[in-house]
């Protein structure tokens, strides 16, 4: 039986860097080793099938969140330009080991959402979005979808083993 690969987007190629084929990546991952350590990665444009590529090396630009990486076979600026707009992916089975109490954002998908004041279930986490801060997309029991900022003040409790998380929404968050 074939296991279905779940792809994690870890960044997006935003520009070529110099003349030797390096590219700039805007990361969507908190794990720097994904952009620095050599090894297999995958590139995807829109809904195309991911294509395997070897990351040779990478470094973070000092004072910025951008990484500059070098891929095998990408050895000039024109080849680097052709990669702009592609997403950088990894297989979700290659997630870093975490300390106790930590979790991967992907683990939040499918969790039931409960209100802090009365523990009533109001919906389920259906997607994750990174827009400066991480946002949880929650499908309410009514069918409506809302974005919930993933910050400790609004999501104070997460029980992965029990399959739920608690929200303490500010007034009006679910009324829009």
UniProtKB/Swiss-Prot annotation:
Q: Which GO terms describe its cellular component?
A: cytoplasm; ribosome
Domain PRC barrel positions: 100-173
UniProt KW rRNA processing keyword? yes
- Main subcellular localization, coarse class? cytoplasm
Ordered alphabetically, the record's keywords are: Chaperone, Cytoplasm, Ribosome biogenesis, rRNA processing
User: What are the recorded Gene Ontology BP terms?
Assistant: ribosomal small subunit biogenesis; rRNA processing
Q: Which GO terms describe its molecular function?
A: ribosome binding
Return the Gene3D superfamilies for the record: PRC-barrel domain, RimM
Free-text comment about domains: The PRC barrel domain binds ribosomal protein uS19.
Protein function: An accessory protein needed during the final step in the assembly of 30S ribosomal subunit, possibly for assembly of the head region. Essential for efficient processing of 16S rRNA. May be needed both before and after RbfA during the maturation of 16S rRNA. It has affinity for free ribosomal 30S subunits but not for 70S ribosomes.
Report quaternary structure and partners. Answer: Binds ribosomal protein uS19.
- NCBIfam families reported in the protein's UniProt record: 16S_RimM
Q: Which PANTHER family match?
A: RIBOSOME MATURATION FACTOR RIMM
Name of this protein: Ribosome maturation factor RimM
Source organism: Prochlorococcus marinus (strain SARG / CCMP1375 / SS120)
Supply the source organism's classification.
Answer: Bacteria, Bacillati, Cyanobacteriota, Cyanophyceae, Synechococcales
């Amino acid at each position: 039986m074939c296991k279905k690969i779940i792809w994690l987007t870890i960044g997006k190629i935003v520009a070529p860097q110099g003349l030797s084929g390096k590219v700039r990546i805007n990361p969507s991952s908190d794990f720097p080793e994904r952009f620095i350590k050599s090894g297999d990665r995958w590139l995807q444009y829109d809904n195309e099938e991911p294509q395997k590529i070897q990351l040779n090396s990478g470094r973070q630009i000092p004072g910025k969140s951008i990484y500059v990486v070098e891929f095998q076979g990408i050895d000039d600026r024109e080849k680097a330009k052709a990669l702009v707009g592609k997403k950088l992916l990894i297989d979700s089975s290659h997630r870093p080991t975490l300390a106790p109490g930590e979790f991967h954002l992907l683990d939040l998908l499918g969790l039931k959402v409960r209100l802090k004041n009365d523990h009533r279930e109001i919906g389920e986490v259906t997607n994750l979005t990174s827009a400066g801060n991480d946002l949880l997309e929650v499908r309410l029991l009514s069918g409506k979808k809302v974005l919930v900022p993933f910050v400790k003040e609004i999501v104070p409790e997460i029980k992965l083993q029990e399959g739920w998380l608690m929200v303490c929404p500010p007034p009006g968050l679910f009324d829009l």
